[in-house]
């Protein structure tokens, strides 16, 4: 359990950028710290950027990372200072997260299926803070249930628990979250006077469910439109068969959307259904050119999904990225690493080299 007294020293919260789970984590944490009468600065990080490389170095109070971990260099500099809290569930970050000892919680995807950044934010911060302060119980007894359900719906979707009854609702919530800028969900307060006369400024969405039912329904409509984009992406998939570790491994490559809601998970699910009964391991790779900051050169980002047990986290890690067994990714600088070849050629070559390493 992260000590409440350590949470009270938190100055900055870092969460995963361009990700509904990262946004939901930030919403839950903002709410939790408001219960403590605090408002730490919230920033969103993208893996591999200069902002990520510098996050956590400042030494101003405690820094909380959720749904993303500090870089190994920052971890080495700060591990002994007791100024970093890390909550994460990405497989490739396990050793780094656990190295922070009692100020870290790692959710193992096999032991804790469905536990994501949002779930960790609720379980390790929101729920203990609410128990300590009683603020939400006092305001509205049903709210803690709503927060937990919100977190677990997002978690089911983020970790792709397709058999979880909350998965579909998590799809709708995630789609709605990503349809608006983070400031929409994190801004806005409401002054509430309690029965004992105390006055609290709380986030507008802390008093009611984080998403109103009408917003979830909007997310459902957006998701249904999104499914048409998935259908079109599946039609554009280029398939390859590679030999690795003594078996055929299929590679399915398509061009991702550069912004907005990513298609890779849903394309992978559609391909899984199309190839139902096929036992060969497979990798689904969506690629997009992404500009992280205005003025930066575009980077080539690969989103990976594994089918039939293929460990895409290991493949991503071999290329400087990370993630989960079934969902991972990495990025490359196309100006240095893609000279003379297309993303289709590049990802095929990288997977072939990875498979050769498994079965030299």
Please annotate each region the language model reported.
Residues 155-241:
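Hydrophobic, aromatic-enriched interface-forming segments
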């Amino acid at each position: 359990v992260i000590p409440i007294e350590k949470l009270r020293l938190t100055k900055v919260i870092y969460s995963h950028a361009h990700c509904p789970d990262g946004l939901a984590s930030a919403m839950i944490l903002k709410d939790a710290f408001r219960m403590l009468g605090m408002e730490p600065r919230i920033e969103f990080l993208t893996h591999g950027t200069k902002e990520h490389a510098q996050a956590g170095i400042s030494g101003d109070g405690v820094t909380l990372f959720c749904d993303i971990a500090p870089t190994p260099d920052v971890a080495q500099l700060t591990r002994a200072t007791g100024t970093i809290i890390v909550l994460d569930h990405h497989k490739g970050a396990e050793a780094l997260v656990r190295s922070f000892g009692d100020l870290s919680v790692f959710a193992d995807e096999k032991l804790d299926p469905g536990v994501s950044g949002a779930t960790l934010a609720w379980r390790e911060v929101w729920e203990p803070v609410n128990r300590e302060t009683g603020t939400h119980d006092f305001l509205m007894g049903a709210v803690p249930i709503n927060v937990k359900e919100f977190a677990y719906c997002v978690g089911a979707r983020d970790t792709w628990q397709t058999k979880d009854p909350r998965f579909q609702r998590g799809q709708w919530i995630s789609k709605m979250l990503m349809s608006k800028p983070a400031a929409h969900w994190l801004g806005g307060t409401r002054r509430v006077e309690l029965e004992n006369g105390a006055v609290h400024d709380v986030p507008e969405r802390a008093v009611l469910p984080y998403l109103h039912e009408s917003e979830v329904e909007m997310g459902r409509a957006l998701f249904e439109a999104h499914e048409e984009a998935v259908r079109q992406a599946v039609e554009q998939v280029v398939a390859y068969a590679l030999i690795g570790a003594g078996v055929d491994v299929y590679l399915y490559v398509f061009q991702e959307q550069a912004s907005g809601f990513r298609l890779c998970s849903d394309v992978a699910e559609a391909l899984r259904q199309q190839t139902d009964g096929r036992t060969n391991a497979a990798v689904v790779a969506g690629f997009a050119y992404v500009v992280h900051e205005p003025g930066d050169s575009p980077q080539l980002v690969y989103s990976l999904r594994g089918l039939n047990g293929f460990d895409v986290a290991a493949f991503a890690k071999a290329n400087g990225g990370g993630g989960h067994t079934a969902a991972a990714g990495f990025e490359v600088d196309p100006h240095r690493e893609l000279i003379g070849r297309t993303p289709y050629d590049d990802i095929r070559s990288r997977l072939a080299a990875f498979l050769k390493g498994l079965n030299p």
